[in-house]
Every structure is written in structure tokens, then in C-alpha cells.
A protein has these predicted regions:
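Hydrophobic transmembrane alpha-helices and their helix-loop junctions in integral membrane proteins
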Residues: 2-166
């Protein structure tokens, strides 16, 4: 979060990059809060804090360590989806992205492409046993991905700056 905000606000002499850096900071804080809250709720529900044991290292959920209901999985899963959406700049957390590309081109492209998008995807893959417990949650993830793809395509059509379109 800090690195992204500082990178976006790299040209700090102008007000626009600084304002966008604050937006990035806020989005990442919401994402971090959702991830922390999901971990706290999951620990409260299961009494387990070790993700390797909790997720059963690839064994079908629930492994022998913890059982959660479909409704509990939905609550924890929604928090995890919010965390992943914030990290990967999915809708509704993607509004800052077209304006954030005022930073240095190579570093902003590498940093965002190599880290941010992959953080959200890795998180969802890592907690996929929880997501699989709730069909509604799977539809939410698919819907967010679809809406984000359409939004990105429409945004790219009207952008005049190449970096903003990417």
C-alpha cells in the first residue's frame, strides 16, 4: 500500500498525483481492513489461526481442523473478496487506476502488473476452499471479474493517454 501510494504520488510538485496517491492509500487501507477482519472472524469461528492447517493443504474443505457453515463461509468469503478486489483494483475499487499512471512508466507498470494484480489473485486462489463452500460467493467473484473487464474495456475506449488506457 505505501509503495503504491508513493509511486503514484511520485511527481509530488503537482496536486493531481498527490491526490491520486491519497486515493490509492485509502483503497489499500480498506482492502487491508477487510483482510484483517476476515482473518479475525475466521479465527473466531474456528479457533484456528494457521492457514495451512485451516485450509488443509489442498485437502477438500472442511479438513479435520475446522468446520464452518455456508453462511459463515459467505461472510468470511465476502470479506476476502473485498480484500482481493482492493488489491487487484477490481470494481468498485478501480476508480483510482486510470488516474494513477502519472508515476514513472517502467516502475508503475512493473509494480502494478507484477504485484498488485497478483496479490488479489493469489489471495482468492489460496482461500478457494472457503469460496467453494458458497455458490453465491462464486457468483460474486465471477460477477466482479465480468464487471471489471467490461468497465476496463469501456474506460480504455475513451482514454486519450496510452498509460491510462492500459
Amino acid at each position: 500500500g505505501v509503495s503504491s501510494a508513493l509511486l503514484v504520488a511520485f511527481f509530488h510538485e503537482r496536486t493531481s498525483p498527490v491526490r491520486n496517491g491519497v486515493r490509492v492509500w485509502a483503497v489499500y487501507r480498506v482492502s487491508d481492513a477487510a483482510l484483517l477482519l476476515a482473518a479475525v472472524v475466521l479465527h473466531h469461528l474456528t479457533g484456528q489461526g494457521d492457514f495451512d492447517k485451516l485450509l488443509g493443504l489442498g485437502q477438500p474443505w472442511p479438513s479435520g481442523h475446522a468446520e464452518i457453515s455456508q453462511q459463515q463461509a459467505l461472510i468470511v468469503g465476502l470479506l476476502l473478496v473485498v480484500a482481493a478486489a482492493g488489491k487487484s483494483a477490481l470494481v468498485p475499487f478501480s476508480g483510482w487506476l486510470p488516474r494513477a499512471m502519472e508515476g514513472p512508466t517502467p516502475s508503475s507498470a512493473v509494480f502494478y502488473g507484477a504485484l498488485s494484480v497478483h496479490l488479489g489473485a493469489f489471495l482468492l486462489l489460496r482461500v478457494s476452499p472457503i469460496l467453494a463452500l458458497s455458490p453465491v460467493l462464486c457468483l460474486v467473484v465471477i460477477g466482479l471479474g465480468l464487471i471489471t473487464a467490461v468497465y476496463a474495456a469501456l474506460t480504455a475506449r475513451v482514454q486519450t493517454d496510452v498509460k491510462s488506457a492500459l
